[in-house]
Amino acid sequence: MGLLFKQPEGTAGKAWPAILISGFVAFGGILFGYDTGTISGILAMPYWARTFSTGYRDSTGQLNVTSSQSSAIVSILSAGTFFGALGASPMGDIIGRRWGLIASNGIFVLGVVLQTIATSIPPFLAGRFFAGLGVGLISALVPLYQSETAPKWIRGFIVGAYQFAITVGLLLASVLNNATHHRNDSGSYRIPIAVQFAWSIILVGGMLILPETPRYLVKKDNIQAAARSLSKLRRLPEDHAAIREELAEIQANHSFEMSLGRSGYMECFQGNLLKRLVTGCLLQALQQLSGINFIMYYGTQFFKNSGFQNEFVITLITNCVNVGSTLPGLYAIDKWGRRPVLLTGAIGMAVSQLLVAVLGTTTTGQDSRGNIIVHDAAAQKAAIAFICLYIFFFAASWGPSAWVITGEIFPLKTRAKSLSMTTATNWLLNWALSFSTPYLVNYGDGNANLQSKIFFIWFGCCFLCIGFVHFMIYETKGLTLEEVDELYMEVDSARDSVKWQPRGVARGEKEAHGAETDFAVETAKGASEQQEVIGDAGRSL
């Protein structure tokens, strides 16, 4: 860490406690990625297919599930995550970010239990739904917790670590699937599913000892607890000037926001908050429409149907690329900024998807039974290489950046609500794509049989990403969450955000509100010094 990032000079305290705490919370991404990744391999396991088949036989004459059953099994997780993400706002605001994550794990474990014991499709579907409900809650609460605890100069890396954890979860799923798919018993699919208990236990164990976020505690008027939380995160005494100044900034900002009216869902759709919400929702939607989860959900099955040998190994390779490519993206987002990283990634993804589509379409055919005929083996290998190149560009840009940006562009009073809606958008598109993909790709009656042509669709969406970044994404590198709020209030065009410098959020109004605020930080210097600190904090904004 020290080789890549250096704490800015003059910054009081230590950054490593906040980095470790926020980094550990990213472990929630393991649950997300692993649960997403297991199903691709499980659908391709012969024993699972025979066990859960209702009598349908595929083109090879083997017992299997139908396209509609496969679609339901994969997409039901995303349906659960959609409702879970929407539920994250009331849960996070009522019981807190920390206890919300703990409760979410309980729901997730229920889903894992049902999937593990299932021997038919209905209980398996129920398990996938409840697991999705838990994952949806976690997927909104983790970036929320991270963005509210991370130091501003490394916030992109820390929140982006959530995406890294997702890729690690996907990789672990492919490793377990590859290790058990040859088994001719229920262990072939039950072992990969049951391993998820371990991830949940680790996350809950850590959350029991980690602090609540200081911004949530300020929102609840528990200023003493907020000071203690900041003290743990910055490794400074509660009465240290830096702690009191940061606490003053957080509380003054929240006081100013609340002076404009109580927060509700309708407020998320007003003024520049609507612009931020549209930006966040479109960002998450386009992340899904880039085609990444086609590879993650159906990659193993697609490679198998396309005539590739060792499809489990290919999936393992693509997941290794996904993990390794996320690391440079975490560095780049704080080094070069959000806009350059997203723009470069969008261009790289578009070119890669176009080449995969052209190679796959022009070098393969089908026989009368729908089996793929490969005319050029070298071109197929090249297509795999470009899929890996696409994954590199995605993992180094849009993968982590979507979570980073949506976690930092909303003000405190609507942050949980807005973030839950942007995350729900991600899962809504995730569900739509996972449900429709079998019908779009597979051969047979009622199916579009696009095969590799589907990559033309992903190319078109990636091309749209380029314009979206240029016109909609604000540059927020190196800003506190309060300064990001100021940026959106002062700058109308995303293109002008690069030149903006923070000067304090509505300085006059916030000083007035800050002067009336009781920070309740007990120190020997008494209330008069507290008032002086409030004034100093207001002038420093």
Curated annotation (Swiss-Prot):
Glycan attachment points: N64, N178, N184, N253
Keywords annotated in UniProt: Glycoprotein, Membrane, Transmembrane, Transmembrane helix, Transport
Annotated localization: Membrane
Domain of life per record: Eukaryota
UniProt cross-references to InterPro entries, sorted A to Z: MFS_dom, MFS_sugar_transport-like, MFS_Sugar_Transporters, MFS_trans_sf, Sugar/inositol_transpt, Sugar_transporter_CS
Taxonomy of the source species: Eukaryota, Fungi, Dikarya, Ascomycota, Pezizomycotina
Organism from which the protein derives: Aspergillus rugulosus (Emericella rugulosa)
Keyword Glycoprotein: yes
Protein's membrane topology: Multi-pass membrane protein
Gene name, Swiss-Prot/TrEMBL: ecdD
Regions annotated as coiled coil: none
Protein name from the UniProt record: Major facilitator-type transporter ecdD
Any GO CC annotation of this UniProt entry: membrane
Signal peptide bounds: none
Chain ranges passing through the membrane: 15-35, 72-92, 106-126, 129-149, 156-176, 191-211, 277-297, 313-333, 340-360, 384-404, 418-440, 454-474
Protein family per UniProt: Belongs to the major facilitator superfamily. Sugar transporter (TC 2.A.1.1) family.
Pfam entry (one): Sugar_tr
Alphabetized GO MF terms: carbohydrate:proton symporter activity
